[in-house]
């Protein structure tokens, strides 16, 4: 059986309490990598322990074995559990044993007609839904599926308490955003992404990886198969073991690729619409985003795929398509609501704090930084091509003072990554003339604060 962390046990307790109060549907929100499957397995175990039947719905066949193994490891009575794809359940309504509880993982998909067909048929059965992002491109909420919502600990807390890995975020732009066009679904079309990326020098992708994440186990997210394969070829030509995988890859070949990646035989795994949900490789420490998107769900799932916690691990996120300008960072505070959000003509609301890229090392940093916390070099503003989110609300910040004789000050020259103690971050802040908040922010980002 699993030993739940306190924050996971709290989710279990809150969910059971809501169900005991006759809630028809409870939506549980917890960040990617926070161990939602373990929470689900514990709720299923406690339900079957009382003789209740559980129906667990998945939207992809590949996830069935994974959740089944998780349930079995947690001593869930599988005789009382139905684990199937939503399509198969919808086609077997009336033939399957009636459940006492319906559990849906990745429930941001649950507005689809197939899910609604199941929920309507079992209208008197309470349901639990799990997601990291209760958000849809069309702005629709989930109040017609769930009547209450429980939020777990945020990403920033999970990093600070060593349940998620701290990260570095770099953005070396390889896309012309002015050429991106949306489809009826609300996300960018593949054709417009082709135009926006243009004649990408794939060697630049490899060069950036070598500079920022050399040797790290890396997942690449591409927008189409041809592009993904060309990126893989560029890595191979550089002598780096790499492979491409997508939904059309044969099952046996796909299993071998996944196995080789998990074992370390492959350093680079590039994919198209395959590795976002339910794929767990804790020692993957880097992701490369080559697919621009308007989907917050997709951004979070892809950006945080490398942030599974391991001792001394520092994740690296390389964003070649400036998705951060649309969504902020993985640990940007977000306001979730069952009612959804009001869609705007020029994209969705971005509550992210203003951020920009350092022109020297391409680290994404708060807009008020005048000295990069990653490379220690002075940052000038837009005149030097800084990528700044001008749609974000600018919060009032104090003036930063640049330390005179910068090159002579050993603490001013140090990077935040080079120190291990919180007090050393405060020394760097003092040497550079920063306010104490800079040290606190970096201490949280680096996982030094509990």
Regions of interest found by a model, annotated:
Residues 99, 268-271, 277-292, 315-319:
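A short beta-strand element within the Helicase C-terminal
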Residues 306-331:
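Conserved segment of the helicase C-terminal RecA-like domain
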